[in-house]
């Protein structure tokens, strides 16, 4: 198989690699078993994770975009099972019309569940809800020998599957904890600040007023640290049935 040029998400970096497109878990397993001589494999879906870690020059990249199915929603237990290639955008479009939401999601809606787990990303609610890995209840994974098994939260291997960029396991499926929401809209406050102290004061103020989502964009060319602060909370009175992200 010839090497192909592949770019990172921002198209600022690239590499030449063999790219494979498996359609089943068995095909992924066979790729690993039949290419034991291969020095390095990397796995990608949307390719939007920080660090561009999937770039594998003169190696093999296994594309997991085919694994993009939502497998099960349990409204009673507030859980959902998805494949690794499901994008955050697709997940929210599925959940929110049903009155559910997911904590600790990144601002990049093209990110996939597998990438969010491997990078252990956080959202604008990180000060309250922590990281994306806190949503994960169990995983279906594959090891470097092509063997598939399930690991539950609390298992000794569980923590090594989250935030390790695929060095421990290939994530195939994830069972996630979801939360109820009564709205599909947010009330957003946007404020300018002229220095870092004012920014810190805004964070403290909005934390006390129970805005669960906060963030700031800072002008680093200004030594005083000016920028834009945003805080958001659910707009409970919304009657909107569906919103697309």
Where does each model-flagged region fall?
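N-terminal regions that are enriched for targeting/export leaders
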Residues: 2-10
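Glycine-rich N-terminal segment of FAD-binding domains in flavoprotein oxidoreductases
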Residues: 10-104, 120-125
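Short, glycine/charge-rich beta-strand/loop segments that flank catalytic centers
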Residues: 46-49, 104-117, 218-220
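Flexible loop/turn segments at secondary-structure boundaries
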Residues: 49-52, 89-90, 111, 178, ...
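Structural signature of FAD isoalloxazine-binding scaffolds in flavoprotein oxidoreductases
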Residues: 51-71, 125-146, 170-177
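C-terminal substrate-binding/cap subdomain adjacent to the FAD-binding core in PCMH-type
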Residues: 118-119, 137-245
